[in-house]
From Swiss-Prot:
Pfam families: DALR_1 (PF05746), tRNA_synt_2f (PF02092)
Organism (species): Sulfurihydrogenibium sp. (strain YO3AOP1)
Keywords: Aminoacyl-tRNA synthetase, ATP-binding, Cytoplasm, Ligase, Nucleotide-binding, Protein biosynthesis
Protein family per UniProt: Belongs to the class-II aminoacyl-tRNA synthetase family.
Subcellular location: Cytoplasm
GO terms under cellular component: cytosol
Oligomer and partners: Tetramer of two alpha and two beta subunits.
Molecular function, one GO term: ATP binding
Domain of life per record: Bacteria
Protein name: Glycine--tRNA ligase beta subunit
This enzyme's EC code(s): 6.1.1.14
GO biological process: arginyl-tRNA aminoacylation; glycyl-tRNA aminoacylation
Amino acid sequence: MKSYLLEIGCEELPPKAILTYKEFLKEYAHQTFKDFFIYNSPENIKIYATPRRLAVLIKNLKKKQDNQKITLIGPPYKVAVDSEGKFTKAALSFAEKNNIPLEKLEKITTEKGEYLGATIEKEGESLELFIKHKIPQLFNQFPQLKSMKWNNSDYRFPRPIRWIVSLLDDKVIEFEVASVKTDRFTHLHRFMTKPIGRGERKDINHANDYEEITKLGYIIANFEDRKHSIKTQYEGFARQLNASIIEDDELIDEITCLTEFPVGIVGDFSPEYLTLPKEVIITVCKHHQRYLNFEKDGKLIPKFLAFSNNAVKDRDIVKNGYEKVLRARLEDALFFYKEDLKKKLDDNIEKLKGIQFHEKLGSMYDKVLRNLELALKLADLTGYKDAEKIKRAVMLSKADLLTEMVKEFDELQGIMGMYYSQKQGEEEEISKSIYEHYLPKTAEDNIPETNLGTLLALADKLDTVISFIKIGELPKPSADPFGIRRNAIGIVRLLVEKEIDLDLRKVIDDESILDFILSRLESYLQSKGYKTDIINAVLSLKDGNIYRNYLKVKALSQLRNLPDYENVIMVFKRVGNIIPEDFKFSNVDVNLLVSQPEKELYKKFIEIKDKFKRFIENKDYDKALGLLLELKPYIDRFFDNVMIMVEDEKLKNNRLSLLKEINDLFRNIADFTKLIGG
C-alpha cells in the first residue's frame, strides 16, 4: 500500500481561505484518487490546515490503477462491412487509429443502431505518473478567493507559497508551481523552533511521518484536533472559574484558523464595564480581539480567554498586553454608550434621510416608510390590530444606525436600538421588535418571539427582496451582496415557523419575485429532508401561501408511508395524465352517466367534495388526503370498467369532465403527475 503527501507551505492564510480550501482538498482527493484506493475507508484521506500550511495525506493506494475493459464504437456496421462481409476502408481506418487487431472487431448493438467496434483492455496508469500529471493541475482548481501575485510566475494564491512537499512514500514527486519546486522539507512552528520567524526546516523521510513530525515541531496540523484543543481549554478554564462557556462555533473556528499551537490565557477586565450591555462586551471581544467570554447565571463575569499561537514563557507579560488592548476598546464602547444615552432615538429618525440605502432605492428613511406601508398591510392581512404600535416600532427600527455605538460596531444594529429605547421608556414589545426585526440573520438563527417583531421582520425582508429584484439586482450563484437570498430564506422561515397563513400574492405583484421566494422554500424543504418529487408536485402549482405549501409537503410525505403508496400514486397520476391539455371543461351531466362505475364514482365525488374543501380551508391536509384515498377504489373500478375515449363525443367529454373535477380536487394539494412512483 502506498501513501501520498502534498503540503503547500504559505505565508499566513486568512481564515476564509483555510476553511474553504480544506473542504476543497478533501473532495478533490476523494474524487481524484478514487480509482487507486485498495478499499474505501474514512482513514484513506487526512486533511491538515493551519495558517501556514494546507496538506493532504492519502493512504491505502495501489501502485497502479486496475486495467479497464472499455468498448470503442466505430462507424455504422453497414458502412464498415461490405456486402461480401469484408471490412471497408472506414473499418480499417478505425482499427488502425485505435491500434485494434482486425480479429478484435465485432458488431455492437446500441440504442442508435448497429456499429462496428471492439472491447479492449486499457492498461491502468501508474500512481507515480498519475500524481506527476494530476497534482500540478490542482493548483489551478482551487476555488476563486481574493488572491495575489508575489513573483514573476503570474500564479495567484491568497498568500505567497514558500514550499511544497510532494512525497509518494519516501520519493519526491517532482513538479514546479509558482517558481517553487517540490521537495521533502517542511517548516516547523515559526516562533517555537529556530530560526525564529521562519521555523526549523525539517525533512520528511516518509509521507506517513507527517503528523508526527509536525506534532514534534509544535504544530497541531489537523484542523479538528486543534479546534478540539481550543474547546477543551475553554471548558477547562470555565470550570476553574466556576463559570460557563458561551457557545460560539464561528469564533472558535476563526481562532483555530489563526493558530498552529493554541495556548489559552485568561485575562481580566474592570467590573465597571459590566454596565455595558452584554452584547457590546461580547462584540468587542469577538470581532476586534478574538477573545472568548465567560458567564455565570446568564451574566458575564469580568474575565476573558485569549489564545496565543505559542507557549510563551512569561504569560503575565502577554496577559497584560491582551488586557491593555481590551481595556482601550471597552473604554471607547463605554464612552459611546454614555454619549448615545444623552440623545433621544426620535432625534435620529429625520437624519435617516442622510443615509443612502441604495442609489436606486433612496435613503434609509425611504426604506423605513416602505417597511411601514408593508407592515400595516401585513397587519391587516394577519389580524394584528395595534396600528399605532406598528407605526412607532417601524419608525424607531433603524434609528440606532446613527448612534455612536452602531457606527463603531455595526454588528450591534437593532441590539442597541432595543437597549436605548428601553432606557427612554418605550413599551417592551416595541423595544424588543427593534432587535427582532433583523431576525433571522442566518439560516440557523433564532426567529422573533413577539408578534410585533415578526411583523416588522417580515416587512423589512419583503421590502428588501421586492425592491432589489425590481431594480434588477438579483443575487449571483457565488455572491449575494445585498442579502436578497438570505432575506428570502428569512421570509420562508418566518412564515413557516411562525405558522403565518398568508398568500404572498396579496403583497407581491410580480411573479418573478414570488418564484424566487418559492425557490428558497424549495431549498428550505430539501434541507429538512423532504423528497424532491413531493416538493415539486406541490410547488409547481405556484400557490403563494408559503405556510400552506409547507403543510402540503408534510402531509404528502406521510402518504408515502402507506404500504400501497405506489399503487395509490399510479391511480392518482392516471387521472391527471388522461385529461388532454386543450380539453374544454363543462359541468358533469348526470344524465350521461350510463355505467354503474361512473355513477358510483360521481356519487362518491359529490359526497366528499364539500367536506374536502372544508379540510383544505382549515389547512387539515392529512384529512383531505384521507378523503382522496376514499375515492381510490371508485377510480379503480371506473378505469377497469369504463372506456373513456369512446366515439360518442358527449359521453367522452362527460367522463373527462368528471375526471377533471376530481383532478381539480387533487390540485388543491399537489400536481400528482409529478410524483415519482406508480
